[in-house]
């Protein structure tokens, strides 16, 4: 059974145990996916993010933290900070790999079986879409092989270009 599914749509409407939020380092909400998740999940997500911020000062690039999901169709939101693309010579690939590995570490720790990822860093952060998709799939396949309890990973693409890229790379 193929455990990776590619979906074109809004991640806030996808039912899974955990959804990944591409946050900023403050964890206080923002634009794009981050803003959509905070709006759809309600104030409980921001309150939990503020508590994390009080304890550890936010979240660094490549790291991840977990909160409840509020009114989203999920149990958890895993917040991570993706890298900004510079020129490919400033560890951007390694940082993006760390994003996925940090998310999967929390998935394993919490016994999560289904998780939904948006496209990470390919919007305003400028990461080349094909490069980001290849990195994502490489790490996801590795993590699925390492963690046999993962049943399903949804790759939720807001735009057709990322959706088509994932489909091509998976086939």
Swiss-Prot record:
Residues 1-171 form the Macro domain. It catalyses: 3''-O-acetyl-ADP-D-ribose + H2O = ADP-D-ribose + acetate + H(+); 2''-O-acetyl-ADP-D-ribose + H2O = ADP-D-ribose + acetate + H(+). PROSITE patterns: MACRO (PS51154). It comes from the Bacteria. SUPFAM superfamilies: Macro domain-like. It holds the Pfam family Macro. InterPro entries: Macro_dom (IPR002589), Macro_dom-like (IPR043472), O-Ac-ADP-ribose_deAcase (IPR024900). Substrate binds at residues 10-11, 24, 32-34, 121-125. CDD domains: Macro_OAADPr_deacetylase (cd02908). Keywords: Hydrolase, Plasmid. The active site is at 34 (proton acceptor). GO terms for biological process: purine nucleoside metabolic process. Its EC number is 3.1.1.106. GO terms for molecular function: O-acetyl-ADP-ribose deacetylase activity; purine nucleoside binding; ribonuclease inhibitor activity. Deacetylates O-acetyl-ADP ribose to yield ADP-ribose and free acetate. Down-regulates ribonuclease 3 (RNase III) activity. Acts by interacting directly with the region of the ribonuclease that is required for dimerization/activation. Homodimer. Interacts with RNase III. Belongs to the MacroD-type family. YmdB subfamily. This is O-acetyl-ADP-ribose deacetylase 2. It comes from Pantoea vagans (strain C9-1) (Pantoea agglomerans (strain C9-1)). The lineage of its organism: Bacteria, Pseudomonadati, Pseudomonadota, Gammaproteobacteria, Enterobacterales.
